[in-house]
Design a protein with these regions (language model features):
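Structural cue for short, hydrophobic secondary-structure segments
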Residues: 77-82, 111, 267-268
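Conserved alpha/beta-hydrolase
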Residues: 104-119
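A domain-start/cap signature at the N-terminus of enzymes
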Residues: 21-76, 84-100, 104-108, 135-142, ...
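Cap/lid segment of the alpha/beta-hydrolase catalytic domain
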Residues: 115-148
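Conserved acidic catalytic loop of the alpha/beta-hydrolase fold
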Residues: 152-170
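Bacterial N-terminal signal peptides
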Residues: 9-18
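Bacterial N-terminal signal peptides that target proteins for export
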Residues: 1-10
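Serine-hydrolase catalytic core
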Residues: 238-280
Length: 280
């Protein structure tokens, strides 16, 4: 299992935000100035776990700040785990990156945990199979006959972060992932209209993705652009927009293509990331 290299993580975090040195007081829901802040959770991930209720189900996540409380954080990094579904490791690695930069009081770290049946502990837990979560596919049906796209989980996180009563100083959110998590982030970037959240700049960082989504049927090689022949299903989701999932169908394929091309997405490829047997 590989994690995001520390140097890459530092770079990803450092381009997120340039902070002002001025202390800006938080204004709570009652309108009163409040300069107090909750101390960030910086210990091991097990101590920084919370539950996000979405529709009539829930998903666990790790966070350095409580999403249901008011904070004066300026930025958020949402880090998505790889195939090993080890959100705790990714949370701890990104926390170490933020601490390395001395920004633990200014940047919150959030790491969702997309689980399978094997990790399911509660009847309300949303869960997927080992690959469907990273494609934005629907979870398995709950006992109530409902399901949710894994993309919908990040939607809920962004919706909460866009609440200016709770996060009055928050201006930027970076969504990043490594390997399978990078594949998730790259495909998810096609679902968000630029400036969809008026008070938030949402950016994406894709590090060592397993594969890449293309906006059309063209592909690239050392010889240039070409359209593959005798290669069935090469343009199917998540490699292309053919036979996409219900989330994309509701959004609209043409909208997704437009969003894909308009969003701010940074790509990172590790020179030494050449192992082909490790699918994390």
């Amino acid at each position: 299992m590989k994690l995001l290299p520390l140097k890459v993580g530092v770079y990803i975090a450092s381009f997120l935000i340039v902070f002002s040195c001025e202390e800006i007081p938080v204004t709570d829901v009652s309108g009163k100035a409040n300069t107090e802040r909750e101390s960030p959770c910086l210990s091991e991930a097990a101590n920084c776990t919370d539950t996000l209720k979405i529709d009539r189900g829930s998903i666990n996540y790790y966070s350095s700040f409580d999403l249901d409380s008011s904070h004066d954080i300026r930025g958020v990094i949402v880090t998505v785990h790889g195939a090993a579904r080890n959100g705790d490791d990714y949370f701890e690695r990104m926390i170490s990156v933020v601490q390395e930069l001395g920004l633990q009081e200014e940047i919150a770290v959030i790491a969702p945990s997309f689980i399978t049946l094997y990790e399911k502990q509660n009847e309300l837990d949303w869960y997927w199979n080992t690959t469907s979560w990273k494609w934005g596919n629907q979870s398995y049906m709950s006992d109530l006959g409902e399901s949710i796209s894994s993309f919908g989980v990040i939607d809920e996180v962004l919706l909460r972060l866009s609440n200016q009563n709770q996060f009055p100083n928050l201006s930027q959110v970076l969504i990043t992932g490594h390997s399978s998590g990078a594949a998730f982030v790259q495909t998810y970037s096609s679902t968000k209209e630029n400036n969809q959240y008026k008070n938030l700049m949402v950016r994406f960082a894709v590090a060592n993705s397993q594969y890449f989504l293309y906006p059309d049927s063209s592909r690239y090689s050392n010889q240039g652009v070409y359209v593959p022949t005798n290669c069935n299903n090469y343009n199917n989701w998540p490699l292309g927009f053919t036979d996409s999932n219900p989330y994309i169908d509701v959004l609209g394929v043409e909208n997704a293509k437009m969003f894909f091309l308009s969003n701010k997405v940074e790509y990172f490829v590790g020179q030494n990331d050449t192992e082909t047997s490790d699918m994390s």
